[in-house]
């Protein structure tokens, strides 16, 4: 893992250099769409002591100067499946954003939604020889524990300290200069499939771009869609994309768990296409314009003209004038959405979400906009549920403030104001890359 440590530090330095030059692109590669926004930076901002160790990661103010979205191609379950098609789509979206911004970008930060994420927790503890916590003590405690293997072909995507303790004083965001005898840390580590990560890196390079960072789409969506109190007191963000549904849990303003359900809104569209025998573009139109999950007595009488949007007239009167009731449409959509939510429920149960002090659930992503989803999710998940829109950032167009762009906005926030990661610290050479892990569920229940 020494190579990983150095690679992440290199990307972090590339991000800082791009920000110093003033321009950095954010690239959200999803199953249904690919979005690129170009950020203009005003230089390093003032570090905020309340955000943790903070200065290691570096923070800056920014505004959006270019933005473009196109249909995704070659991506399945949030992972690149057909390299050539995805490359063409990425080139197209980056060129569109560059044209609007009037600048050329060379460095991008990208998101990854699939890749079979797995959460782990780790704990480290050291003795303070000086009786006070210094910068090197923070680095030493992060490298203090031995590590079992993550498994073959796994890569670390995030490794964030979420809690420090000095002697009996726990819940510290920044332990530096605290007086004591022992320093302990809890850290959340998120790993992903290495092949999916390598394919993303290869795609970016084929587009003549340099990768200045990679972030979890579920983590990014949570940063954008959860309000400050939810991130502090505990909440789950459910990012319902086209091919995958990301799950992230936040507590004390840190992500402490992440996973994904390999189902999304595209399956709902496919069910409509097969159930009503209509093309996929017609099924998508029916889902977005007339879809729903809660049937009423009037839905049997509300007829939707399908033939008018299926394509050119065929000459067959019954086909060209075909209609379906909204009740039939809801009857097709609801079982699949229930299946997705059941998968989310299983993930939350495995994470011990019921033990959280606050059990707020925030739905975001494109599929979260289906009418009636919040009510259905409330019954299945058994929690307080709301639909979350991403935070407004300066210069962002209105069409990019919808829930489907939560991960994009969160990735911009992550680029400008990253939380500290393991590789932000100067590790002792002999210990860099040596960290101890426990399964996240056990760690979560024991430490929070």
Residue locations for each model-derived region?
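Nucleotide/phosphate-binding catalytic cleft detector across ATP-hydrolyzing
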Residues: 1-236, 255, 279-281, 288-330, ...
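A short acidic Gly-Thr/Ser loop motif
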Residues: 27-33, 112-113, 237-244, 250-253, ...
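Basic, amphipathic juxtamembrane/active-site segments
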Residues: 43-51, 251-271
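Glycine-rich phosphate-binding loops at beta-strand->alpha-helix junctions
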Residues: 113, 192, 291-294, 356-380
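A conserved active-site cap/scaffold subdomain adjacent to cofactor or substrate pockets
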Residues: 262-286
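A general structural motif
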Residues: 336-345
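Hydrophobic, well-ordered secondary-structure elements that form the walls
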Residues: 344, 363, 411
């Amino acid at each position: 893992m020494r190579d990983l440590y150095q690679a992440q530090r290199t990307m972090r330095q590339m991000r800082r250099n791009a920000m110093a030059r003033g321009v950095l692109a954010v690239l959200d590669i999803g199953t249904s769409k690919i979005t690129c926004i170009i950020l203009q930076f005003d230089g390093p901002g003032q570090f905020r002591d309340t955000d943790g160790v903070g200065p290691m990661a570096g923070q800056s103010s920014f505004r959006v100067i270019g933005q473009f979205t196109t249909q995704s191609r070659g991506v399945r379950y949030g992972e690149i499946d057909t390299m050539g098609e995805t490359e063409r789509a990425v080139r197209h979206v980056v060129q569109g954003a560059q044209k609007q911004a009037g600048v050329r970008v060379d460095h991008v930060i990208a998101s990854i939604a699939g890749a079979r994420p797995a959460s782990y927790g780790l704990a480290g503890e050291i003795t303070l020889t000086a009786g006070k916590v210094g910068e090197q003590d923070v680095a030493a405690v992060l490298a203090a524990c031995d590590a079992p293997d993550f498994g073959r072909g796994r890569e670390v995507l995030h490794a964030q300290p979420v809690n420090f303790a000095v002697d009996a004083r726990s819940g510290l965001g920044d332990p530096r200069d605290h007086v004591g005898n022992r320093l302990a840390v809890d850290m959340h580590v998120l790993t992903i499939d290495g092949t999916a990560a390598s394919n993303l890196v290869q795609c970016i390079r084929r587009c003549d771009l340099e990768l200045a960072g990679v972030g979890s789409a579920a983590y990014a969506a949570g940063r954008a869609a959860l309000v400050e109190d939810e991130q502090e007191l505990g909440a789950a963000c459910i990012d319902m994309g086209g091919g995958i549904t990301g799950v992230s849990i936040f507590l004390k303003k840190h992500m402490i768990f992440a996973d994904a359900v390999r189902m999304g809104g595209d399956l709902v569209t496919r069910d409509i296409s097969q159930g009503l025998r209509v093309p996929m573009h017609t099924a998508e139109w029916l889902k977005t314009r007339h879809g729903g999950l809660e049937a009423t007595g009037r839905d049997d009488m509300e007829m939707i003209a399908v033939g008018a949007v299926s394509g050119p007239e065929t000459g067959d009167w019954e086909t060209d004038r075909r209609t379906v009731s909204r009740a039939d449409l809801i009857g097709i959509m609801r079982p699949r959405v229930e299946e997705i939510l059941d998968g989310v429920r299983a993930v939350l149960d495995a994470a011990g979400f019921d033990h959280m002090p606050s059990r707020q659930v925030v739905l975001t992503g494109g599929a979260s906009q289906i009418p009636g989803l919040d009510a259905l999710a409330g019954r299945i998940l058994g929690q307080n549920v709301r639909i979350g829109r991403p935070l407004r950032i300066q210069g962002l167009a209105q069409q990019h403030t919808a829930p489907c762009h939560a991960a994009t906005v969160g990735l911009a926030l992550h680029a400008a104001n990253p939380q500290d990661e393991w590789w932000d610290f100067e590790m002792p050479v002999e210990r860099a890359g040596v960290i101890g892990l426990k399964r996240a569920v056990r760690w979560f229940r024991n430490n929070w």
